[in-house]
Amino acid sequence: MLNAGASAVHPRPVQRPPLQVFVAGTFDGLHYGHLFLLRYARRAGLAMARRLRRPGVRLSVVIARDDSVQRIKVRPPHHTQRERQQLVAALRLVDRAFVGQRDDFIKSVRRAQPDLIVLGYDQSAAWEEVLRSAGVQARVVRCQEYRGRRLKSSMIRGDLERMRT
């Protein structure tokens, strides 16, 4: 029995965690297309968070390892994985940037525990199947090209080379 001066105990509502958004990439020669992708990821995450009544988003970005860049792009990166990680981490849009696991993309995904994975327009469609077959439950969306045109670091480097000659 409560005395007249005591107040009833009200349980605190359970605070849900922010929505986890995940982006992966090389980010070698950071440019506006990268910024467009990260802004798109945050906006898509905020829209999903509102629908799910989650208190905002946390954007995690995994940076490709130097050996992965060499294997995929058949050239060494211009910036080291540490430099690329620091550049991306310095962006206000990004809550966390880390270098990916050696030879295991799925470990990097699991480390981030994403609710939403945003792929760039130029990332392989095979990643969606790889994620599904690994049992990743996150929703996967693809960012469109910036202003309907392809913007890639390799294109920028090519333009700079042509300007030098």
Which residues does each predicted region cover?
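Nucleotidyltransferase catalytic core that binds NTPs
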Residues: 1-165
